[in-house]
């Protein structure tokens, strides 16, 4: 048996390959074959090289998983898929109750019938969630900084500076299963499949990615000034922001459409799309059995 390791060298601020090498401490019952994900041209061809006894292990972060689930959309992986977190945020890993450098686990149940989002006429599969508002702005600024410097990106600093000086709130229409809600002065409007995004923020603390109804949750933070928003913002890391009912609302549904009155950056699992005026996210349609998470050595 071989563990076929798909690693992203750019994950974890460029330490993806070195972090993936740590798998040798966990996967001791078979051979380890490493593949640079950025060099794979066709997953259909790659899957044909796998044998029935192989296990595919993805080593990367949330963006790595997003690329994998979208690059393999419509394909069936012939072997089990495991995951080992080597990213900087690791929101999916955190949602599973795992910690950095925990052993890899099988994630097949979490990749089935994923929610989809349509942006600018293109459909994407969504693992964690879609960020729209100042969170999308932060990803766009972070991308620019990453392109010009090797330093670690401080998204908290970007968010604070954005709140105070650069990002202007928008007016939005949020339509949940056909019911429209008008929202003025919107700072955040993410729709989530899991609980976490943005490196530990928890906009929808009650969202369950395997809920039997297949629903997703949208959180809107709006109607507040800069300083009030800045005071509320830190509580999003604990999920306590939802108690601020005069500033935060959460709706749950199968189809959620968010429209802004001007183009704003959007991010899907950390991957940025600029100049977006609306998106539509559809939840899962198939009921799933909740898996028991087990890892190497457990």
Predicted regions and their residues:
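Gly/Ser/Thr-rich active-site loops/lids in small-molecule metabolic enzymes
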Residues: 146-157, 199-227
């Amino acid at each position: 048996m071989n563990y076929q390791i798909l690693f992203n060298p750019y994950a974890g601020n460029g330490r993806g390959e070195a972090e993936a090498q740590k798998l040798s401490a966990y996967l001791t019952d078979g051979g380890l074959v490493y593949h640079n994900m950025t060099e794979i041209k066709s997953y259909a061809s790659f899957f044909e090289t796998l044998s029935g006894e192989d296990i595919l292990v993805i080593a990367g972060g949330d963006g790595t998983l997003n690329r994998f689930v979208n690059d393999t959309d419509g394909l069936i992986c012939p072997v089990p898929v495991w995951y080992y977190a080597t990213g900087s945020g690791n929101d999916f890993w955190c949602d599973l109750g795992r910690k950095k450098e925990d052993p890899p686990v099988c994630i097949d149940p979490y990749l089935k019938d994923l929610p989809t989002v349509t942006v600018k006429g293109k459909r994407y599969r969504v693992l964690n969630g879609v960020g729209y508002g100042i969170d999308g702005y932060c990803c766009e600024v972070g991308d620019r900084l990453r392109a010009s410097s090797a330093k670690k990106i401080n998204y908290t600093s970007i968010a604070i500076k954005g709140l105070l000086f650069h990002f202007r709130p928008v007016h939005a229409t949020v339509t949940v299963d056909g019911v429209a809600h008008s929202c003025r002065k919107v700072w955040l409007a993410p729709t989530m499949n899991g609980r976490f995004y943005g490196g530990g923020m928890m906009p929808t603390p009650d969202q369950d990615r395997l809920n039997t109804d297949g629903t997703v949750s949208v959180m809107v933070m709006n109607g507040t000034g800069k300083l009030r928003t800045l005071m509320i913002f830190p509580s999003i890391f604990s999920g306590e922001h939802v108690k601020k009912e005069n500033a935060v609302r959460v709706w749950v549904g199968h189809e959620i459409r968010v429209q802004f009155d001007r183009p704003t950056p959007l991010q899907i699992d950390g991957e940025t799309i600029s100049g977006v005026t609306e998106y539509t996210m559809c939840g899962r349609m198939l009921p799933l059995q909740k898996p028991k998470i087990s890892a190497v050595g457990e």
